[in-house]
Structure formats: C-alpha cells, structure tokens
Amino acid sequence: MADEENTTEILLSVSLRKARFSSKSRRADTSIKMLKDAVARYTKSDRDRIWVDNKVNELIWSRGRRKVPTRVNIKVIKLEDGTSEIILP
C-alpha cells in the first residue's frame, strides 16, 4: 500500500499510560484511540484517515483487554493523499 506513492516515514514511541485511567474493560479500546490521536497530532491529519496495522492491534491486545502495554514503538507512514498507516518498525 505504501510502495506506490511518495511517503514520509516517522518513528514514534507513544506512551499509553493514561489508558490506565479508563475502566478496566475498555483499556485496549482506549489505547487504540490514544494511538490514533497521537499520530493525528504528529502528521496533522484527521483521525478517520489513520489506518492501524493488524500487528499493532495484536500487540496492544496481546495481554488481553485489561492489561495494555504502557509504551509502544511504532512507524508512521504518511501518504500523499493524507492518509497515514501505523505499523511496527
């Protein structure tokens, strides 16, 4: 998907500690939203135009819904059309 167009790549380390303030049954969902918000802030794009790779999703959900990792290292690829992809480095 990213090979076809001109792209910009960014390596980020996103802290997900504030997801611990949400209820236990919604921590993984909150972490995905926080991840998208952080990427939207750095790439200056809309949150709806951000695509999360399946491996990143599996990393956040790896220990279940209640025990999310506190920090995630990701690679963001911003495409020319304004969409962004979140993948593992």
Swiss-Prot record:
Q: Cite the entry's keywords alphabetically.
A: Ribonucleoprotein, Ribosomal protein
Q: SMART domains of this UniProt entry?
A: Ribosomal_L31e
* GO terms, biological process: translation
Q: Which InterPro entries match?
A: Ribosomal_eL31, Ribosomal_eL31_CS, Ribosomal_eL31_dom_sf
- Which SUPFAM superfamilies does its entry note? Ribosomal protein L31e
GO MF terms held by the record: structural constituent of ribosome
| Top-level taxon of the source organism | Archaea
The record's listing under Pfam families reads: Ribosomal_L31e
- Quote the HAMAP family the UniProt record gives: Ribosomal_eL31
Similarity field: Belongs to the eukaryotic ribosomal protein eL31 family.
Q: What is this protein called?
A: Large ribosomal subunit protein eL31
Q: Which species is the source of this protein?
A: Picrophilus torridus (strain ATCC 700027 / DSM 9790 / JCM 10055 / NBRC 100828 / KAW 2/3)
